[in-house]
Amino acid sequence: MNFVPDSNIAHNCLCKGAFSQYSRAYVITNEDLRYSLQFMPKETNRALTVVGSGDHPLFASLYGAKHVDTFDISYNAKCIMDIKVAALQSGLDLFDYEQMLYELFYCRDITGLKNIDKIYEKLPSVEYKYLCDMKKVSLFHQGANPQLYSRFLPNKREYGRLKDIVQKPYTFVLSDIKDLGAKITKTYDFVHVSNIFDYVPRDKSFDVLSSLLKLVNPNGRILVHNQMVWSGPSCRKIAETFNNWRHIKEKDNINILERIR
């Protein structure tokens, strides 16, 4: 990723509170990834997933994706993802990992957190400098109290497995969903966009979703959460418009598109 964060711009964006490249990140997902990822193809070699809280790529690896690339509109999402990967690599136990996330949600100066030195030494230098420059600003105070979502964290067995399989940071693309299809040239067996389409204007939903189709290999899938009503119709319209796609699930706020050839 060629993006170089600017702490002055980040301060201004966070003060305004609008969606931006520096929007605050969640520390724990509120999505049941154990449920969602049962719909990932069993032989997934390559997956592309939104970062969110960093849990999406971790669980994609846990559920069998051999190579995982990531994207998000916010650089702070990359930061929380890399912090989690660094925690795994530095040998934090599950209790300390959970406590770190709860503290990240509430604190402004993360340089004083327990175990943070172990984390910092494993982060990219540019990211380390950014976090130090932003140490008086809350970067991860997003959403509700993360302890409400503790059930979505890895359990002891899953956490131990992640320590074994996550050996390096995930590749990251900083991008709005509407530009993602133009920025990525690789193709994938599974693309997980979660609930991003809740934030795409209704009249743009079909076009934006269509732009992602070229990222998917034959027999691959796109998973879309549809808490808002319009992503479901857009998924059905994709299947009606493109004869190499089918809409195979619309249940529990999940839509799945599958490329059949």
Regions picked out by a protein language model, each given a short descriptive name:
Residues 1-43, 116:
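S-adenosyl-L-methionine
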Residues 206-218:
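A short glycine-rich, Lys/Arg-flanked "PGG" loop and its adjoining helix->strand segment in the class I
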Residues 2-8, 74-167:
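Class I S-adenosyl-L-methionine-dependent methyltransferase module
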Residues 42-45, 180-192:
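A short acidic, Gly/Pro-enriched loop at the edge of an enzyme's catalytic core
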Residues 188-203:
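A short SAM/SAH-binding and catalytic strip from SAM-dependent methyltransferases
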Residues 192, 218-230:
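Conserved beta-strand signature within the Rossmann-like core of class I S-adenosyl-L-methionine
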